[in-house]
A protein has these predicted regions:
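C-terminal helical cap(s) of enzyme catalytic domains, especially alpha/beta-barrels
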Residues: 235-250
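Short glycine-/acidic-enriched loop or helix-start segments at secondary-structure transitions
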Residues: 22-23, 135-136, 236
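Structural motif corresponding to the early beta-alpha repeats
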Residues: 2-105, 163, 194-196, 231-232
C-alpha cells in the first residue's frame, strides 16, 4: 500500500519476502495460493509478477515438478491476465559465457521451462546474477531455437546492470543492455552501488543510471521497472527518492 501511494504501478513479489504467501525454504518452498489471491484482490490498480530462485542454469529444475508447477500457478494468480515468472539462479558460475558454444548443455534446459510456462500462457524471464546480461541474452537466443515462435516470444531476460557491475566488473553491463534486442526485455531492475557498496536508494553511483534510462528510452521499452531498495526503517522514503531521481533523468 505504501509503495502504491508513492507512485508504484507494478510490484514484484519476491520469494523469502512474502510473509503468509509462502511456506518452506529451498526445495521445500511453496506458495500459498489462497493468500496470494487475497493479496492481489486487494490491489486491483496494481500489476504484479512473481520472482523465485531456482537452479535453472544447472538443469536442476523439473518443468513438471511440484515446485515449478506451484510457482506457475502462483504466477498466474498474481499476474492476472499477464502472468510473469522471473527466475534467478544465485549459484556462482565458473566463467562468463561469451559465445553460444560456451553455454553448457544443462543451462539449455531453460527451454523446457519456457515451453512449460508458455503452455500455460506465462512469460518466463531469467535475471543475470552469476552470468552477465549478454550471457543470459545468448542463452535466451539459443533456447528460442528449440521453441516455437510463440513460445520464444514469452522467454526473455530480466536485466540488472548493477548485478553485473558488482559481479563481473571487467564486462560492459550497459553495453550488454544496449545490445540486447527489445523483445528480450521482460522486466528491468534498478538499484545502485557506490564503491561496490549497496546504496539505500537509487542515486548517483557506480551504475550510470542516466545512460541506462537513455538506453531504455531509445529502445522504446515500456515494460515494468523494479526498484530494489534495501530493507531500512526509511525504506518507503528511499523508494520515493529513487522514483524522483530516475524520473529526473528522462
Amino acid at each position: 500500500r505504501d509503495a502504491r501511494d508513492r507512485g508504484a504501478k507494478h510490484i514484484e513479489l519476491r520469494q523469502t519476502f512474502l510473509g503468509n504467501c509462502e511456506t518452506g525454504k529451498g526445495e521445500d518452498w511453496r506458495p500459498v495460493i489462497g493468500n496470494f489471491q487475497s493479496l492481489v484482490d486487494g490491489f486491483p490498480d496494481l500489476s504484479f509478477n512473481l520472482a523465485i530462485a531456482m537452479p535453472c542454469l544447472s538443469g536442476g529444475v523439473d518443468p513438471k515438478g511440484e515446485m515449478f508447477q506451484q510457482a506457475l500457478t502462483a504466477a498466474k494468480v498474481v499476474g492476472r491476465e499477464a502472468p510473469h515468472l522471473r527466475l534467478v539462479d544465485p549459484a556462482p558460475q565458473d566463467k562468463v559465457w561469451e559465445r553460444p558454444g560456451d553455454i553448457p548443455e544443462e543451462a539449455l534446459s531453460v527451454a523446457d521451462l519456457a515451453r512449460e510456462a508458455a503452455a500455460q500462457g506465462i512469460t518466463l524471464s531469467v535475471e543475470n546474477s552469476g552470468q552477465s546480461i549478454g550471457a543470459i541474452a545468448l542463452l535466451v537466443a539459443k533456447c528460442r531455437e528449440q521453441l516455437s515462435e510463440e513460445e520464444g516470444k514469452l522467454l526473455g531476460v530480466c536485466p540488472d546492470p548493477t548485478n553485473q557491475i558488482r559481479r563481473q566488473p571487467d564486462t560492459d553491463a550497459l553495453g550488454d543492455l544496449e545490445a540486447m534486442p527489445l523483445d528480450m526485455f521482460k522486466i528491468v531492475h534498478f538499484k545502485q552501488v557506490r564503491d561496490g557498496q549497496a546504496l539505500l536508494d537509487v542515486d548517483d553511483g557506480d551504475m550510470d543510471c542516466a545512460r541506462m534510462v537513455q538506453i531504455l528510452d531509445s529502445k522504446g521499452y515500456t515494460g515494468p521497472a523494479i526498484f530494489e531498495i534495501p530493507s531500512h526503517q526509511d525504506v518507503f522514503e528511499n523508494l520515493s527518492k529513487s522514483f524522483a531521481y530516475v524520473e529526473g533523468l528522462s
